[in-house]
Amino acid sequence: MTLSRVSAINWNKIEDDKDLEVWNRLTSNFWLPEKVPLSNDIPAWQKLNAAEQQLTIRVFTGLTLLDTIQNVAGAPALMTDSLTPHEEAVLSNISFMEAVHARSYSSIFSTLCQTKDVDAAYTWSEENTPLQRKAQIVLAHYASDEPLKKKIASVFLESFLFYSGFWLPMYFSSRGKLTNTADLIRLIIRDEAVHGYYIGYKYQKGLEHISESSREELKHFAFDLLMELYDNEARYTEELYAQTGWVDDVKAFLCYNANKALMNLGYEALFPPEMAEVNPAILAALSPNADENHDFFSGSGSSYVMGKAVETEDDDWNF
């Protein structure tokens, strides 16, 4: 019997320097939700009214669904199209961190919320038409056999679809509410920014190997898919934020991030500046030093608690 050869990954022979660069960024950014003191937000949570609490739980449940998709379907689908073993390794890291993100929302729920309210939100997520629709749209492309279209769908999920949900904790944070929860969300946003950038980079590398007509076809596909997702996301936003008066602000944030998603793919912005004008308070809440709780690049800060090792001495054991 003839055995096929199996090659071990060799990080000392890199075919694409971007793989090592992004691997190092992702591993240096590694974090876990257990290190964020979410319990410090209990007093602020209790001051939210019932409608605000329900909205927050629903927002985070919707985000959990997207992270679940990216963990179990999105990143694994991209791994099958990897051009290098190092790209495959980076995508496996991305897949794992999406699981961490999904776990993080459960940490928020178990710390701040009543189980019955969380259970109700999960039921809501399975019955909400726009939420289920965007999941189905993305999953359909992940199941296809067209690698570059998979990457387009993945970039739109990473760099656009999350942001109708990310808006809310940034809004609360800008008003001094749920600041530790916002720190955790910033950790997630930092990861998603790297994910969207990297997958977009791999998409642009893939374009180098196809014809001009195929490139044009993919560009049209990308813009058409974005508009399909945007129309659905606008409906989702209108339903989710219906009673708040914040719908227009969230839609502006969507347009802003849709343009960023297109830029990750190497394309020009679609939405004009007047449609993508985000409230400065939200942009300030997104900034690396918002609330001075969080170091955006190192993952450390007063809200991310890391233990310090101290050498013991003989006297320490004299009880």
Task: Put a short name on every predicted segment.
Residues 1-319:
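Non-heme di-metal
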